[in-house]
A protein has these predicted regions:
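Bacterial N-terminal signal peptides that target proteins for export
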Residues: 2-14
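Bacterial N-terminal signal peptides
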Residues: 12-24
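Boundary at the C-terminal end of the N-terminal hydrophobic targeting segment
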Residues: 25-27, 35
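Thiol-based oxidoreductase modules, predominantly thioredoxin-like and allied folds used
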Residues: 48-51, 94-121
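A short beta-strand-turn-helix
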Residues: 50-68, 98
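Short active-site neighborhood of thiol/selenol oxidoreductases, capturing the structured segment around
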Residues: 64-78
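Typically the conserved alpha-helix immediately C-terminal to a functionally engaged Cys/Sec
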Residues: 81-97
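Non-catalytic, surface beta->alpha helical segment in thiol-disulfide oxidoreductase systems
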Residues: 87, 128-180
Length: 180
């Protein structure tokens, strides 16, 4: 190997070392959580208001005669999902409206948070059933029993993120929800 090839090889090795060191240092400085916008921390809806088990939500829907809101989200990585939660779902206006009008179901596809395998399987099946291509997506459904003992989730509408806060979001979904 001649001197120019040795010099070139050393440069490549040195550049790879510097690049690896720089990337490693940058990765250590990335915050592990996304900060909430100012003014959103004061109102947190009851976490138990959001079901994760669809069968429990169906039972509640039968009992209350309310439709189910299926919220497909990537809670720990999807920027638009986090915005929707902060700007709409974590507000007093939405919490009050939801308690009166729908059964809330969170169908989460996290990257960092662990979930029971049964929830992962349920969420994957529902994602395929509703052909969800992106997050956040909210499907509104009414469960209806079929003659063969199964349950049909009749779609009544869908929505995702939209600007305008809780009032605009609620006005949009109220257009297709059953009237009381």
């Amino acid at each position: 190997m001649n001197t120019s090839n040795k010099t070139m090889s050393l440069r490549v090795i040195f550049s790879a070392f510097v690049l690896t060191f720089t990337l490693n240092a940058c990765a250590q400085n990335v915050p592990s959580t996304v900060a909430k916008p100012a003014g959103t921390a004061a109102i947190q809806p009851d976490a138990e208001a959001w079901e994760t088990d669809l069968s429990k939500a169906i039972a509640l829907s039968y009992e209350t005669k309310k439709p189910i809101m299926l919220f497909f989200t990537g809670s720990d990585w999807c920027g638009w999902c986090i915005r929707l939660q902060n700007e709409v779902f974590r507000t007093e206006t939405f919490t009050k409206w939801a308690n009166e009008n729908v059964i809330l179901v969170e169908l989460d596809y996290p990257r960092k948070k662990e979930q029971p395998q049964t929830i992962k399987d349920q969420n994957k099946q529902l994602q395929q059933m509703f052909a969800v291509q992106g997050y956040p997506t909210c499907h509104f459904v009414m469960p209806t029993p079929t003659d063969d003992g199964r349950i049909n989730l009749a779609s009544i509408g869908q929505n995702g993120y939209m600007a305008g806060g809780p009032d605009a979001w609620i006005a949009k979904v109220t257009e297709f929800l059953p009237k009381k």
